[in-house]
Structure formats: structure tokens, C-alpha cells
Amino acid sequence: DARLRTDFNITTGIKSAEIEKFKRKSVMKTYYQKAGIPTARWCVTADVTEAQAFAKTVGWPVIAKPDNGVGANGTHKFKNKTELNKFFQQEGPNAANYILEEFVDGEIVTFDGVADANAEPIYAASHVTPDSIMEIAHGKKPMWYYVAPEISPELRKMGEAALKAFGAKSRFFHLEFFRLKTAKPSLGNAGDILGLEVNMRPAGGYTVDMLNYAGGLDLYQIWADMVAFGAAHHPLARYHRYCCCAGRHDELRYRIPHEELLKKYRSCLNAAPRLPEVLAREMGDQLYIASFEDEAAMQAFRRDALARLRE
């Protein structure tokens, strides 16, 4: 949409010259800092000596991600100097296209929604991914995340500040943050929130559907209202529920078979889609999306959906 605005001189949103801050993680960090939001320490370099010095400063492990990329694709975790050196030997000058970050032990919390022409949220919600996206993508953890019924005041404050700093006008937004699981002197206390990445688009996968199920709304209709009228002309959240997503892999055996799980949770399930092979390796072949009024019921579903038979 930035290219279209540039080509036709449409002044209601982002143009091509401004897009870099939404594409490169290293640039995103500076805008988070502009908003007063702390981030993990980072560096971009093709010099292995500089990378080693960075690792010595922040401690192991160290994370490397494509500076211009989405999701967990191309993400590496280095536990020691040998692994870091091997990466730089393999990548050569291309290593400068990666951003190195200190490791953060945290769950991902988001600020998702639609912003108006003043970079203020018309509607916002949040989803939580307790496990590392990298571990999910590499098959070490099952796919599991959920939309929360409320946004914490701290997260809302940071999300709104980030929208202003990035100039996120008249668009969908999907802002990612870490919420620390454990204290770390350089980062903060358990529960503190750090800026991670921004995406000026709807959240991926079935997340928009989950936001709709959780709130009883139509987020794409709200976006269309924003484009046409500058504000929502249709109902915002009618209720505040949890909506979760669990993923199963076909090659694994689960304690509760598929059909039995569908029957047990038929009143709560919103959808049970099969994923194409290109997505199944990371997310699971079979997804279950369900809504609940309280967290205890949602966690019971999580256990039933993901519990595996002992081999």
C-alpha cells in the first residue's frame, strides 16, 4: 500500500520512503527507543571480532536474525564462541544482513488492531505466545498461543507510544513485545515489557479470526470503516473472551484422539483447520481454535489438545 500511495500521491498513510522503519529490525529498535520503550541490546556487523565482543558483553546465548525478515525464518541461537564463529565463516560478508541480539527469556505479547489517521488505535487487542517462536518453528515446542480478554495498562501505554513513534497512521498494526519470565540486570525484572518487532499489517495465520472470535467483532470491517470514514461504524468488542490455538503433528500420538477432542469441545471450538505442508512443519498439521470465558477452562483444553501418549 505504501507503493500505491507513492505512485498516486495519496497522503493518508505511509509512503515508500518511510517503509524502512517497518522492514529492518535494527531500525525498529531506534523507534522503540524513541517511544521510551526498552529493547534487548543488539548490533549489526560482518566482523566476527566485533560479534565476539558483543557476545562477551551481553553473555551467551546470542540470537541472530535476518535484519530484513519475518517470523522465525533464518533465526539462529549461538550457545558459544565456536557456534558464532562457524556462522560468520559460513555467511561471510552476508553476516552484515543479520542483527545480533542478546537472548531474552520471555513470552511474546502483542498489541494488535487498527489505527486511525492520527496513529491512535480505533480498536486494539493482544495475544500471548508463552513459548519461544524459534522453538515452535524448529519443532521443539507445540504450537500454542491465545488472545487475552484484556490488555494490561502497561502494554497499552507502550503500544500506543509505539504507534505514535512509528507514525502508524490509517492501517493495521501488529506490534510485538517481550514480557520477561525471569529478571536480568541489563533488561529488567520478571514481568517487565521490552520492544521486539513491529509489523504494519494484520497478524498472521488465523490470528485475525481469533481476535474476532474473542471479541465478537469483524476486524476487517473495522479496517474498512477506517478507510472509508476514519472511525468504526460497526460494533467493537461485544464481549471479552480467551481464544486459543493449539497445533498437532500427524506423526505424533496424542492421548485424546482427534474425533474425541472435537466431540468433547464441540460447544467451544470455532474451527479445526488442516494446514498445508508448507506451514505444517512449524505449526502442526491440525489446528484447533477454541474460545473460553475463563483461563482455567482454556488451560484444560490446552492439556487435552496437546497431551501425548507415552511411547
Where are these regions (language model features)?
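A short, GP-enriched loop/loop-strand-helix hinge that lies immediately N-terminal to
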Residues: 1-24, 36-44
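Short glycine-/acidic-enriched loop or helix-start segments at secondary-structure transitions
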Residues: 1-3, 73-74, 207
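Structural element of the ATP-grasp superfamily
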Residues: 28-33
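Short glycine-enriched loop/turn motifs at secondary-structure junctions
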Residues: 36-38, 68-72, 281-284
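Conserved ATP-binding module of the ATP-grasp superfamily
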Residues: 38-40, 57, 61-64, 75-110, ...
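Alpha-helix N-cap recognition
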Residues: 47, 78-82, 257, 294
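ATP-dependent carboxylate/phosphate-activation module, predominantly the ATP-grasp catalytic core
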Residues: 102-168, 172, 179, 183, ...
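Peripheral (often C-terminal) accessory segments that flank ATP-dependent C-N-forming ligase machineries
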Residues: 222-311
